Amino acid sequence: MTDFAARLKQVASNPEVFKQFGRGVERETLRYRQDGHLATTPHPEGLGSAFTNKWITTDFSESLLEFITPVSHEIPELMGQLKDIHHFTQTKMGEEKMWPLSMPCYVGSEDDIQLAQYGSSNSAKMKTLYREGLKRRYGSLMQIISGVHFNFSFPESFWDALHGEQDEEARQDTKSDAYFALIRNYYRFGWMIPYFFGASPALCGSFIQGRETDLPFEKIGGTLFLPKATSLRLSDLGYTNSAQSVLKIGFNSIDQYLDGLSDAIRRPSEEFAEIGVKVDGEYRQLNSNILQIENELYAPIRPKRVTKSGEKPSEALQRGGVEYIEVRSLDVNPFSAVGVSEEQVRFLDLFLTWAALSDSDPMDNCELECWRDNWNKVIVSGREKGLMLQIGCQGERLSLQDWAHRVFADLRQIAVEMDSAAGGNAYQAVCDKLESWIDEPELTISGQLLELTKEHGGLGKVGCALGMKFREENLAHSYEQYSADAMETEVATSLEKQKQAEQSDTLSFDDFLEDYFAYLKQ
């Protein structure tokens, strides 16, 4: 019996483990107008305060909505919450719709992309200033690419099954070590996520005007595409950050990770210093370091812990260890009215469990770069049959198809146990469906979307057609987990909380920022 099989057997000895995963979704979507152009209106009043509403906020721009579900332990509950949030939001948007694709709708100029506004409190102004810094550093277009983040945690019963009873400190160390082992395996094998679920093989030609690229794009009308691409969102054209390539952040332990993050947050950037921080009395960015704050670190997966008030993400990890992980490699699913499907969630259950139960040796920077090369190959040409990927840095290679089939042999073992615990065969059905996609790349989401793009004569037309369909679907939805009253109560509560935040400030904005960044001088 392999180590993986032995660990799976230990965990499966308590079937309740598989019913207790913690899951949450954060979904981003642009508001757009009837004509397919980006909406330039403020955040809809009926949604309350984007600063304090726990379900509905904004990301980079006023027009970039972000929906956040609480932690759920049942997939139907999670999907129901997400559908309820979409339904309520659409009822407050008038004729505007939600863009169903990761790559943006038509944007006339970067000036149309208005920074998200959160009110007049110091914390709110800091959020907008951070976005001003992002705009000046990378341009606004890159910042309105939409994605889906999937938050995931194992229950205490999972750790009990593998490690028996432990005191609090030992359990905390066990969890952190195991989540970092999972993260290393995610870097090794997570390219399967863009292979199956990448949904950005094409983009609007205006998106790369003035940007240099070596990619051999083909054209349909105003749309540029790569015939075998899966996720241009994850490529150098999308939401990545070349300025961060000098950073060496390791994933072998929580201490190594936090040391790397601490260095990154303090490292100055000559390029960003040229922008200036406060010029003629106006702030341009929070500071001129490579990262203004920790959130600027680009990563396809992050170790996380819920923060206390005023606490930075790294301080929360230092205090209590890793509590959950955030998967950040999902494009918006263009075939789901809520941007993600139940099948995707089930696959992630399987894949993340496999990544945690499989062997995961320490990884140096050289090896990490080799795995990143595999990701880049899959992102740009993943649907090319026979695509060869590297096995570490030793020069060995294996085809994407062979490698994926090998992983699925393990995933199927997990699926049997999960289905046995839950009743039914939902997990095995997901394995059946996705494994067929390994040998038929045209069935993947990027393959299907590119085919639609060709049929419609461009990406914008596909986006508008799907957006209209999903608007009707979301409006027709009946509440499953929440109610209109619960949503309206949260709107009112959020407005009150924003007001309280604005009334409780005692410092000037200058002093507030100096106080916040005092830790950089330590």
UniProtKB/Swiss-Prot annotation:
This is Glutamate--cysteine ligase. GO terms for cellular component: cytosol. Pathway: Sulfur metabolism; glutathione biosynthesis; glutathione from L-cysteine and L-glutamate: step 1/2. Belongs to the glutamate--cysteine ligase type 1 family. Type 1 subfamily. It is an enzyme of class 6 (ligase). The keyword Transmembrane helix does not apply. HAMAP family: Glu_cys_ligase (MF_00578). Pfam families: Glu_cys_ligase. Its EC number is 6.3.2.2. One of its GO terms (biological process) is glutathione biosynthetic process. It catalyses: L-cysteine + L-glutamate + ATP = gamma-L-glutamyl-L-cysteine + ADP + phosphate + H(+). GO terms for molecular function: ATP binding; glutamate-cysteine ligase activity; metal ion binding. Gene3D superfamilies: 3.30.590.20. The lineage of its organism: Bacteria, Pseudomonadati, Pseudomonadota, Gammaproteobacteria, Vibrionales. Keywords: ATP-binding, Glutathione biosynthesis, Ligase, Nucleotide-binding. The keyword Transmembrane helix does not apply.
